[in-house]
Amino acid sequence: MEERGSPDGDLARSLEQGPEGPETPIQVVLRVRPMSAAELRRGQQSVLHCSGTRTLQGGPEVAFRFGAVLDAARTQEDVFRACGVRRLGELALRGFSCTVFTFGQTGSGKTYTLTGPPPQGEGVPVPPSLAGIMQRTFAWLLDRVQHLGAPVTLRASYLEIYNEQVRDLLSLGSPRPLPVRWNKTRGFYVEQLRVVEFGSLEALMELLQTGLSRRRNSAHTLNQASSRSHALLTLYISRQTAQQMPSVDPGEPPVGGKLCFVDLAGSEKVAATGSRGELMLEANSINRSLLALGHCISLLLDPQRKQSHIPFRDSKLTKLLADSLGGRGVTLMVACVSPSAQCLPETLSTLRYASRAQRVTTRPQAPKSPVAKQPQRLETEMLQLQEENRRLQFQLDQMDCKASGLSGARVAWAQRNLYGMLQEFMLENERLRKEKSQLQNSRDLAQNEQRILAQQVHALERRLLSACYHHQQGPGLTPPCPCLMAPAPPCHALPPLYSCPCCHICPLCRVPLAHWACLPGEHHLPQVLDPEASGGRPPSARPPPWAPPCSPGSAKCPRERSHSDWTQTRVLAEMLTEEEVVPSAPPLPVRPPKTSPGLRGGAGVPNLAQRLEALRDQIGSSLRRGRSQPPCSEGARSPGQVLPPH
């Protein structure tokens, strides 16, 4: 006799021990429903025999072994106790993801096992003795939460997969298709699914009845209330403790466990159920999703192919059960079969299906909050830093061994190099000191020479003006004092070079002096140095340096002054600005446009030398012309009359 299934062991004991080790197999419980009244009327007999609490005889040569086998005489309370759902609830409170789903042929009692019989009428409650696994789990869970010290938040969602479309059974409006998404943190999830928070058993029962009333049901030959969709009711348990805090990221799911109840639609043969039209389309969709689920289970059984790609995306059902089948959850499968001989082929198919499923293993892991993850992260970082410290210490020891022979030479070389740099800096500092001293001496010499030349220029200018005065007066003539004469208009030509003992008069025109300098462009100094009065000027005839410039278009200024003239005039202007000229100096010249600024300090010494030489030549030529010309008569001019230009 061929025996298939799990090895010997007690299901309750294995569930009470919890998920030990890296992998935990899917727990499978088999329930055989009683013979229906229709089957008894047709005279059909039971072909299944339970030999013990874990073995089912499917024929003379076939036997299947599961975690628990429940015959037709077992009640709903016996099923709840044998399945170990309480242990799953405890794991969910500790943060694990737990799933309970039923599987079997249509009409085998899957919905009855989970939710009990359908209500006989509106407002008529189901008898407590007939309540299914879901109602009993809800009552136990809420009673358990009341005795916990820490606050617990309970929420619920309810959906169905009908013709490969996910519909929300708790939506406020009419159910509409919802998309199934995936991310790294949550895995597969339904977007925009309504999650309702509850705090009492009555509120949760109301949510369950609302979902059951919206679920698609139809009648066919084998079942008068056949479910035409897969239904998933999920309880989210968020328990806050001192070591576990709620998630602060709104994009992540709440930290805590969940308990999911999955009522799969039964597989069916269209020929046996007599489905036509829409019922046949629903049957095809149900069979296709169950086939995808069986294919994923077969691939998960192969150790080599389990590490490869598992096609969970082939169906919406396999997407939502991916975490329960091959992920981080704890899964319980309740296989329901019919004992009738008419359903024996489908019953054997269900038994083989459940036998393969209990060999699938998962890796249960409770999600950790950021606070709970911190010690593990710190420990990992500490190990990495210790490893890096050992590696760097080893490299440092190797470098010390290699550099031990070169340490003495490096120190000596560094000392010699430092001494040489200090010597170079000292020599450079001394050279800069000497250069600075030489530059200061050159500056002082240039300033002294400039001062001497300026004094010589001043003296020569005074001599020039004095010579011009004596030449105009003639020898032996003393002009009368203007104080005894009629008043004359004041002179604006020159500052007072010489003055009368009782008043200040101009030595050239013999009129009282009004101020020190003439206004530019108003009065012109008479020509006293040029004896020629002809129409054309000789090339050597130039106006005195202190004369103001005339307009370029006038007859008195036929040409512009040369650059050398303006250079000499600029030197006189700078001396007047620096207050190095005696009060008897000529008035300030007007600076011509577009003239480069003169050099100051030592740069102006050559110009002063040139001016000194020019003044000497001018004084000599003036004295020679004075000797060659006869003196002018006394009556030729009056004391207040200005000499005409020659």
Curated annotation (Swiss-Prot):
Its main location: cytoplasm. Transmembrane segments: none annotated. Residues 540-551, 584-595 have a biased composition (Pro residues). It is linked to Cholestasis, progressive familial intrahepatic, 8: An autosomal recessive form of progressive cholestasis, a disorder characterized by early onset of cholestasis that progresses to hepatic fibrosis, cirrhosis, and end-stage liver disease. PFIC8 onset is in early infancy. SUPFAM superfamilies: P-loop containing nucleoside triphosphate hydrolases. This is Kinesin-like protein KIF12. It comes from the Eukaryota. Residues 1-25, 529-565, 579-646 are annotated as: Disordered. CDD domains: KISc. ATP binds at residues 104-111. The modification Phosphoserine is found at residues 6, 14, 369, 638. Residues 1-13 have a biased composition (Basic and acidic residues). Keywords: ATP-binding, Coiled coil, Cytoplasm, Cytoskeleton, Disease variant, Intrahepatic cholestasis, Microtubule, Motor protein, Nucleotide-binding, Phosphoprotein. Residues 25-360 form the Kinesin motor domain. GO terms for cellular component: cytoplasm; extracellular exosome; kinesin complex; microtubule. GO terms for biological process: microtubule-based movement.
